[in-house]
Amino acid sequence: MGYEKIIRTMRSLVDGLELDVLEVVPEGEIKGIFQIHHGMSEYKERYLPFMEYLAANGYVAAIHDCRGHGKSVKIKEDLGYLYRGGARALVEDAHQLTRELKEKWPSLPLILFGHSMGSMVVRMYTKKYDDELAMLIVCGSPSKNPAVGVGENIARIQKKFRGDRYKSKILEAASFGSFAGKFKGEKSRFSWCCSDPEVVRAYEQSPLCGFTFSIDGYEALFQLMRECYGTEGWICKNPALQVLFCRRSRRSLYWRSAQVRAGSTAYAPGRIQKYQRKIISGDAS
């Protein structure tokens, strides 16, 4: 099946920030819409092969560079800076794209997929907007970090003296140091991202990948973790929503098996009727 690739912009309703959007639209009969939210320190075109696969199988695939990523920045130095929108802006931007997609294809079911940081965005999204979705896919969700409060305190102190645009190596080390240490001795400091060395090389060489978050970005990240693991504020207008939690068995940044069970069971506690957990063997990202 052929497809059309569309690149456009979307002006955020939160603050007017221009967000870059990519859509891959099948030429034949369309079965549904598959909306993707990417992870931290990457960009939308990394998902293009997957989107082309979806389009070849009859699904509209859509993704935006979330604020502070890819082309959704005012200047290149703003990579990792979320323009003080916080976790709320990430969620509202994603919902805005949902509404635009459903206006184009009002009769089609919409599946929302989030990877890594994006998995926390889509989980927080469903606190308010679960009735927009036919299915939610939570992929590679970071484990709940008990040291979030410590990170928030470091961010607060550094912001006072450095400002919220400061790229904090201390916060980066505190957030990911123990994980990166498990890959010590590998050829690349990004070896954790994939078992395929070509993918790792492309990630390492891209100026749009692997950048350090600003203090503003880390504050949003910590807020996402608090919100998506919290038990309060779930409206749950769609208890029939199907939810799939999935992770690679050897991606140790993400949930261990017990954490997958605990995280999915705690999801919208007592209200979601149908969810599934899947741990995929292997170590490719």
Task: Write out the residue ranges for each language-model feature.
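Short beta-strand element of the alpha/beta-hydrolase
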Residues: I30-G39
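N-terminal cap/lid segment of alpha/beta-hydrolase-fold proteins
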Residues: M1-G28
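Alpha/beta-hydrolase active-site loop
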Residues: L82-K102
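Alpha/beta-hydrolase-fold enzymes
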Residues: V122-L208
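Conserved alpha/beta-hydrolase
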Residues: R46-E77
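Short beta-strand/loop motif that positions the catalytic acidic residue
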Residues: F245-R247
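Active-site glycine-rich loops that stabilize anionic/oxyanionic intermediates
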Residues: H38-E42, S116-M117, S249
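Alpha/beta-hydrolase fold nucleophile elbow
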Residues: W105-S116
